[in-house]
Curated annotation (Swiss-Prot):
Pathway: Carotenoid biosynthesis; staphyloxanthin biosynthesis; staphyloxanthin from farnesyl diphosphate: step 2/5. Its EC number is 1.3.8.-. It comes from Staphylococcus aureus (strain MRSA252). It holds the Pfam family Amino_oxidase. This is 4,4'-diapophytoene desaturase (4,4'-diaponeurosporene-forming). FAD binds at V5, I6, G7, A8, G9, V10, T11, G12, L13, A14, A15, A16, A17.
């Protein structure tokens, strides 16, 4: 069969490879001039920067794409586990290193508050049990009809997840110490959600980091995108770049997706898998006579969106890789207040930031004697933060100054401005324009209870035959391992349909 995949982000690349490995003819259409989507790369002034995701969690999910296509993952990506997850700075003189080794972890916890290990381990145990339930009964399956969700098994297993509790509540149930609470709460920002609003299940991220480890891919995270692109080429997939999709064509008589309009041409296919940002697809790519019924264009703006981010890619003329960790988190003095600012549409004068220094793990990513630094500051998306003008250069200069002051929390970056030889910024406007991300959201639809599982955009269209969706705004959600799972479960359904002649 001839299959079209819209989008060459990590979801599209993984899905296309899985389909092609089953013997089908696959073409990927990508609007930009490179693969990767939000897993993007910037090469500038001799530096190589990952532009999007940077932390490799759940490596088995990465490996599975290659293995299930009959290939050895080591021929495509080089993974290695980190001994330490990150350095966390509460202020200039208060930094802790978070290890993966349990003995070291216990020592770290006891140094913060004697006796805290028991509550921490109880938290990890509770969350691990919830994760296993969620993975088996909710995350790794699709919902094609109401009875797939509304059944006794889902009711019983869902009750065990205690989804009405928020991430903050679960953390505070086990942890009294404010510093340790912060260590467990900030990761919800990895998927763009407020820990006060996110279901307690989303506190799984620190559990995954500590129980499964954090890894690094040689060449940076973009090495995964390159590995997937090579996998697709080896499987005979055709990747068309600079191919802007104008419309998904729906046959009005048979109510099926049978073609796409790309760069002015109509291209026929047997099935279409769309991995572009779902809200933008529902709003702009469906014909007027054939909207996605649950998500017509006029309702898209009313959905809840994850936060966005202001990113900086900085090159400095000194090598500091032996004085800083690969991954670093610098907390705002008022951590809770900063989160409120993000989700209430305000910019912060004292933000929490994430700092990634890839040359710590791979010297080839910066010129000799120099260092590349990636900084992410969570911000409101464009709907909540409608009063923020990201095109205002004076404003972005102010934000850069705020970030440089915050970076000075790490001693080696105290005089960073005098060493800058390269600087690039990426704003919520860029998320919207570059990736067609609705409202510049960095992580797609916010995974609130009302926008999760059965209530999230589904992988198999309920309105039109031969149309499928995958990616961060669809089930099961955002984050690289999760969108790889989205690709897997969607392709599994497509292959099942092909085998059954549906």
């Amino acid at each position: 069969m001839k299959i079209a995949v819209i989008g060459a982000g990590v979801t599209g690349l993984a899905a296309a490879a899985r389909i092609a490995s089953q013997g089908h003819e696959v073409t990927i259409f990508e609007k930009n001039n490179n693969v990767g989507g939000r897993m993007n790369q910037l090469k500038k002034d001799g530096f190589t920067f990952d532009m999007g995701p940077a932390i490799v969690m759940m490596p088995d999910v990465y490996k599975d794409v290659f293995t299930m296509c009959g290939k050895n993952y080591e021929d495509y990506i080089e993974l290695r586990q980190l001994r330490y997850i990150y350095d966390v700075y509460f202020d200039r003189d208060d930094c802790i290193t978070v290890p993966t080794d349990l003995a070291e972890l216990q020592h770290m916890l006891e140094s913060i508050e004697p006796g805290s290990t028991h509550g921490f381990m109880s938290f990890l145990t509770d969350v691990y049990k919830k994760y296993e339930i969620a993975r088996r009964y909710f995350l790794e399956r699709t919902y094609r009809k109401p009875s797939d969700f509304y059944n006794m098994t889902s009711l019983v297993q869902g009750a065990k997840l205690k989804t009405l509790n928020h991430a903050d509540q679960l953390i505070e149930h086990y942890i009294d110490n404010e510093k340790i609470q912060k260590l467990l709460a900030f990761q919800t920002l990895y998927i763009g959600i407020d820990p006060k609003r996110g279901p307690s299940l989303y506190s799984i991220i620190p559990m995954i980091e500590m129980m499964f480890g954090v890894h690094f891919i040689k060449g940076g995270m973009y090495g995964m995108a390159q590995g997937l692109a090579q996998l697709n080429k080896d499987l005979g997939v055709n990747i068309e770049l600079n191919a802007e999709i104008e419309q998904i064509i729906i046959d009005p008589k048979f109510k099926r997706a049978d073609a796409i309009k790309v760069n002015g041409d109509i291209r026929k296919f047997d099935k279409i898998l769309c991995t572009a940002d779902f809200p933008s697809v529902a709003e702009s790519l469906m014909p007027d006579f054939a909207p996605i019924k649950k998500y017509p264009p006029h309702k898209i703006a009313d959905l809840d969106y994850s936060c966005s981010a202001f990113l900086m890619y900085i090159g400095i003329d000194i090598d500091v890789t032996d004085q800083v960790r690969l991954h670093n988190v610098i907390f705002a003095d008022d951590f809770r207040g900063n989160i409120e600012e993000i989700f209430e549409g305000r910019l912060s004068h004292d933000p929490s930031i994430y700092v990634y220094v890839p040359a710590v793990a791979d010297k080839s990513l910066a010129p000799q004697g120099q260092t590349g630094i990636y900084v992410l500051m969570p911000t409101p998306e464009l709907k909540t933060g409608s009063g923020i003008d990201w095109s205002d250069e004076a404003l972005t200069d102010q934000i850069k100054d705020v970030i440089y002051r915050k970076l000075a929390t790490i001693e080696v970056f105290e005089d960073i401005k005098s060493h800058i030889v390269s600087e690039t910024i990426f704003t919520p406007n860029d998320f919207e324009q570059t990736y067609h991300a609705k409202f510049g959201s960095a992580f797609g639809l916010m995974p609130t209870l009302a926008q999760s599982n059965y209530y999230r955009p589904q992988n198999v269209s309920r309105d039109y035959k031969d149309l499928y969706f995958a990616g961060a705004s669809t089930h099961p959600g955002a984050g690289v391992p999760i969108v790889l799972t989205s690709a897997k479960i969607t392709v599994d359904e497509m292959i099942k349909d092909i085998e059954q002649g549906v």
